[in-house]
Amino acid sequence: MGLRKKSTKNPPVLSQEFILQNHADIVSCVGMFFLLGLVFEGTAEASIVFLTLQHSVAVPAAEEQATGSKSLYYYGVKDLATVFFYMLVAIIIHATIQEYVLDKINKRMQFTKAKQNKFNESGQFSVFYFFSCIWGTFILISENCLSDPTLIWKARPHSMMTFQMKFFYISQLAYWFHAFPELYFQKTKKQDIPRQLVYIGLHLFHITGAYLLYLNHLGLLLLVLHYFVELLSHMCGLFYFSDEKYQKGISLWAIVFILGRLVTLIVSVLTVGFHLAGSQNRNPDALTGNVNVLAAKIAVLSSSCTIQAYVTWNLITLWLQRWVEDSNIQASCMKKKRSRSSKKRTENGVGVETSNRVDCPPKRKEKSS
């Protein structure tokens, strides 16, 4: 993500520079319209669709819990409105972190323009990954997925989600959708846009797939693992930008990165390949949320394997490029050292007769008569 330059001059209203400088305020005004809609009876029902989770069903509470009923959720068309509103919230939070945290650090550290772009990108992702890891781990613990791992492939009831599970997925979709307008707001370079689009698209594809196929617990576990590895990656980048002596941390991150991909593959294969295949139903129907069909299993497993192979290949190519660049830099440094040593030898009189050598006595000036 690029760094916005704030000029002291006020740009014309509705100009491109005006929108870039004040996009957070503009988005806040749009969000306020939905909040003000709650005040009036005629628009309250429409505003609630954007602000709260939709498609809920009341089910009886368990016997060991308190009497009454609890609400479970499924997905539907109205979720698009909720995702849109929280996408606006993500844009506002993004601008707040950029202005009040990252921009102040940039001024203190006095980074170059290239480092500013990398620092801003790593800073934004670090905050998001850190918050998502804590939130996702809390959901896994509260829904007993760690104490009962079978819940990873068994949702009860099959096509329903709890409030916190659905809100987590809505928030994730909103964040990654907000990354598209941020490419414009942050003045991303044209050569970086394809890489960013692939990165955003892969996250949206897998999060949406887990959400629509009701693989909520499996998707949540894989997201936590993935976000943890990415968090270490961007944290190492932040330390490296602040001081290049932390370059060894990047090598440590590469090991954790490979291990994280292996764990993700193992969990995916065990869950999708064995457990879903072992509980084959006679009349599966993916439209009702039952993903225990051959096409869905092959799609989920192949998608997980493909993305892990793609990301790992990118890491290998990146390290090969760095290795080639480092070797070229070392070769150029050796040439410079050799040229400097040869110059010193010539200056010291090695192979050349000169009176400026150290071991030669200085010439005495002849007195004029």
From Swiss-Prot:
Localisation: Endoplasmic reticulum membrane
A Pfam family per the record: TRAM_LAG1_CLN8
GO biological process: protein insertion into ER membrane; SRP-dependent cotranslational protein targeting to membrane, translocation
GO cellular component: endoplasmic reticulum membrane
Domain of life: Eukaryota
Basic and acidic residues: compositionally biased ranges: 360-369
Domain TLC: 117-326
Membrane topology, Cytoplasmic segments: 1-29, 103-121, 186-196, 243-249, 319-369
Lumenal face residues: 51-81, 143-164, 216-219, 271-297
Alphabetized PROSITE patterns for the sequence: TLC
Membrane-spanning parts: 30-50, 82-102, 122-142, 165-185, 197-215, 220-242, 250-270, 298-318
Keyword list, A-Z: Endoplasmic reticulum, Membrane, Protein transport, Translocation, Transmembrane, Transmembrane helix, Transport
Membrane topology of this protein: Multi-pass membrane protein
Region entry Disordered, spans: 335-369
Main location class: endoplasmic reticulum
Annotated family: Belongs to the TRAM family.
Known role: Stimulatory or required for the translocation of secretory proteins across the ER membrane.
Protein's name according to its UniProt entry: Translocating chain-associated membrane protein 1-like 1
Lineage, top ranks: Eukaryota, Metazoa, Chordata, Craniata, Vertebrata
